[in-house]
């Protein structure tokens, strides 16, 4: 009886943990999450969030599901010598635990794109 109860509990835990989802996108300044998707975690994997910085200035973030080929490995201030970027990676294993920030307002995106267009015209002048 005890073995049957243990087997049932194990099956229930596997069923519940098999449906954990993570956010997947590249998060950029002003634009927010680009190409926003949802991915399902494979057994034994975790959601990941990697923030990239130049000095103390945030450049971008990557949110995704860890995979057997690229598992989530927590790291603080890991520096890429080639690009000079510093990476901080965090891992979590709850449903949608790597939640992205809310989508930017259309007005803010319009201001950014208008400024970018103005800069482009100024450089061409």
UniProtKB/Swiss-Prot annotation:
State where it is primarily located. Answer: membrane
Key word Ribosomal protein present = no
Q: Which residues form the propeptide?
A: 100-125
Glycosylated residues?
88
Residues of the signal sequence? 1-18
One GO cellular component term: plasma membrane
Classification via CDD domains: TFP_LU_ECD_Ly6G6c
Keyword check for Disulfide bond, yes or no.
yes
Instruction: State the membrane topology.
Output: Lipid-anchor; GPI-anchor
| Subcellular compartments | Cell membrane
What range(s) does the UPAR/Ly6 domain occupy?
A: 20-111
Q: Name one Pfam family in it.
A: UPAR_LY6
Q: Which cysteines are joined by disulfide bonds?
A: 22-47, 25-33, 39-65, 92-97
PTM notes: N-glycosylated.
Spell out where lipidation (GPI-anchor amidated serine) occurs.
Answer: 99
UniProt keywords (A-Z) are: Cell membrane, Disulfide bond, Glycoprotein, GPI-anchor, Lipoprotein, Membrane, Signal
Name of the protein in question:
Lymphocyte antigen 6 complex locus protein G6c
Q: What is the lineage of its organism?
A: Eukaryota, Metazoa, Chordata, Craniata, Vertebrata
């Amino acid at each position: 009886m005890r073995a049957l109860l243990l087997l049932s509990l194990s099956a229930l835990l596997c069923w519940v943990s098999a449906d954990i989802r993570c956010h997947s996108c590249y998060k950029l300044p002003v634009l927010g999450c680009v190409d926003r998707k949802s991915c399902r975690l494979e057994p034994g994997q975790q959601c990941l969030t990697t923030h990239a910085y130049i000095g103390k200035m945030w450049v971008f973030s990557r949110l995704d599901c860890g995979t057997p080929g690229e598992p989530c490995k927590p790291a603080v201030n890991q520096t890429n010598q080639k690009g000079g970027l510093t990476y901080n990676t965090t891992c979590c294993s709850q449903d949608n635990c790597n939640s992205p920030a809310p989508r930017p307002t259309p007005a803010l995106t319009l201001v950014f794109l208008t400024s970018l267009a103005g800069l482009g015209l100024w450089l061409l002048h």
